């Protein structure tokens, strides 16, 4: 087998005819500026060709079920293995996918519970075990030999009637004593039972003291009792009838209520199968309901003024119902909703129950008619309309009032009652899936089951333990197996897939990874790199697109692509060992690694103003432990902490949702908190995350940033366009008029090829230009609208520098390092980091008031050291304008330049959720329990770290505020 992957003439996207040789079975890191062509080489060339060749080796029938990659633009490639790509893209948007199901650990857990689980009665908690007569006798012989006992057979359980026939049958069979409702009687003197009351009748089969010499007698007595009691029997002391009886069953059922289960099988524990799913929520764990908080959109207004949309004066039909209600219950329809009595509000929302109300209806002729009936209620009315309508538009409108809540039937466990009551070592399956992965691993390490159960469990437990161990190795010990897949970050999803691949144990495969260190704290980096080297040591080629310094330093072979981004990139600046990269004169990466170039620490940090702070008190969502957060206004604040410590819950789920609802008038669900103070300092809140800017190829940077509108208006002002009467709409590829109708403005036509990949061919009418010939005849400075969309941001800025409305938006795209993007580049081709920076540029182009609260979640994703330097300049510029910038970040270069750092921890999951320290980076670096501080100290001058706890009189306060320790 060849020892090299040979690539010749790679021209995918912006790659400039690259020729290179990569060593196989090594850890290769591809680095370079954002947009320089790293992903084009790793994913769109090497992975695409490896995958394509493997799939093409399959039969034509099999190929039609697989997505075949497009053939990359290159001359030759040799030495490829079958390729597996592990990307950042979110794992699944399916609400049924969880960490357990993705990793297949849940499948092993289902098998474990089906084979060795101990079912119990949900009501009486007795194990469902079919006992033999010998087992029953052996159990009785362990009882106190000094006590007297009686053996009972239940004949009637909790049934109404006098039961005279039962007593006659028992008498005829030779029984002399019975126990009725807990009282012992001779069978001839049983009192007459009350006809309409429930009674329990048990026949006394035997009375004894437990001794070895009565073993045979006991066995015969038990056989009689089981026959009479339909497989049930009980033993009770004769001296004190208040003690709990010993219950026995020869059937697989509860000895008290006869509850039974069919044989356990893995399907019973699957929330995706009808056999195991909770019937109330169909295995989703949540139910939808019309939320009164969303129905009453303006509680400060009156019903007549629009407290409930659609039920005010403007809607005559529904308002006449409210008017009749007001008359019946004597409340004022002009009083605010908040001031109405609770019972009145409940009646309006949920109906009048059985109470009949006189309603006055207006007829079409203008008259009035009276009718008496119950009031349905606003919420039941919405539910009925949602259920009965066949209109998608009506459903979409009504869905605005719907919220989700934990299923009241299963408590969010997704499983039905039977599956929730099967135990392994006194734990149910839902109890295991809510444990953090490191605790679950500990449970399985110490799990010892007796007898045959232990023998069966040993192999299953080994598989579960290994897979849990892999998740811990990639830094995901804080996750739980029941965590929904659609709540995972890109980095978490990628590392889960990485753990699954290690579990597969394949050899001779080529793995291509996209920034696996995203969202990972420096502390966990070592474990991740250990995982990558383990994959390599198995005999695989591991190709990683990465910017993390530790990963670059640990690579066997480094490839630096550049020198710039977009059209300025696509070349190999340097390749080889770490030393070769550091010595290469053209390598920007080498300059940062060698220390010749670095991101500087600010000479002076902006001090916080104690009188201008945003105070959030008692935040306790997910794993937060009543956190009290203080954010200084007008500063650049970093939120740090190990993965799973609660950063996203505190900032995204609590602070942002709260501020957006209060300031922007949004209606996000807010994680629980006690109080908030200081929101009046801000007039706008902006959250810039990494979700895509558009999910269709028609969305692009020009449309998203709002630049396309002034661009179309500019073309409509060209003399030729005015002469023809063209409006700005003529230059849109989304509406009829100016677009090419053959391809409906796509520029491409999809040709389905079945077992080959779908081919997109340029439209043969417009030749891929999206517009019709007449529209393309309109030119501005010699360029038509298609030429402009094909331009890079950099080139477009030169063309439109005299048009402020367009130039301002282009300048901000350049500021955030996106000068290489084409204006019309499809949004679906942008990486998460690029999408986030497009959003940032959109916000930057708006006129800010200096009172905006910006929240960014890991903005350095996908960024090279050089890009980070440019991003920091933008963030500091926002701060200098008086705005408040909050960044959730692991990157130490960003943290060291912050004015204020708030570090959460100390660990992830249940062992996190507290603020360890809040202060300057120097203060955090000096904190003994902060993992962030430990790594940060290495980047800060030693004197700062040692002196951070001391200050001269009058010096600004920058010492750490230590909380919860």
Curated annotation (Swiss-Prot):
It is found in: Cytoplasm. It comes from the Bacteria. GO terms for cellular component: cytoplasm; excinuclease repair complex. CDD domains: ABC_UvrA_I, ABC_UvrA_II. ATP binds at residues 32-39, 641-648. The keyword DNA damage applies. A zinc finger (C4-type) spans 254-281, 740-766. Keywords: ATP-binding, Cytoplasm, DNA damage, DNA excision, DNA repair, DNA-binding, Excision nuclease, Metal-binding, Nucleotide-binding, Repeat, SOS response, Zinc, Zinc-finger. Residues 311-588, 608-937 form the ABC transporter domain. PROSITE patterns: ABC_TRANSPORTER_1 (PS00211), ABC_TRANSPORTER_2 (PS50893). Signal peptide: none annotated. Belongs to the ABC transporter superfamily. UvrA family. Forms a heterotetramer with UvrB during the search for lesions. HAMAP family: UvrA (MF_00205). This is UvrABC system protein A. The gene is uvrA.
